[in-house]
């Protein structure tokens, strides 16, 4: 646990990304992500380091994205630029950055797509290999009221629905 690492004096300086985890451990989003990780481990489910790192670094990405949107940048390029900035500042040349970066980027880039519940967007998104990770991330955001709970509920229902039910959900959105 983070508290135990702090108690042992091992909480900082070993690995730069661990420093970020410790630094963010008190934030609501990181707390719900860590609690969800503990739950998954307790249930014997796998935990992807990229998902946890995406949660820890989300505040940086969100701030950079918001700043770019305030300058009237287009949403997707603004998010891409914010992600690149965070990778350069926080991850650097960490071994495995390629896979970590790809997984994290995919989770983050799905977030604005979840807002679009019309047309073909939901059907394409739900077929993405990392859609479940993106949805789990969205659910954590809803848990701390960063996004509307109804949005996460809609996607939960959509992901489990038949094709006909999905059509109805899109029509109702």
Predicted segments with their positions:
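Conserved, hydrophobic alpha-helical core segments of structured domains
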Residues: 1-170
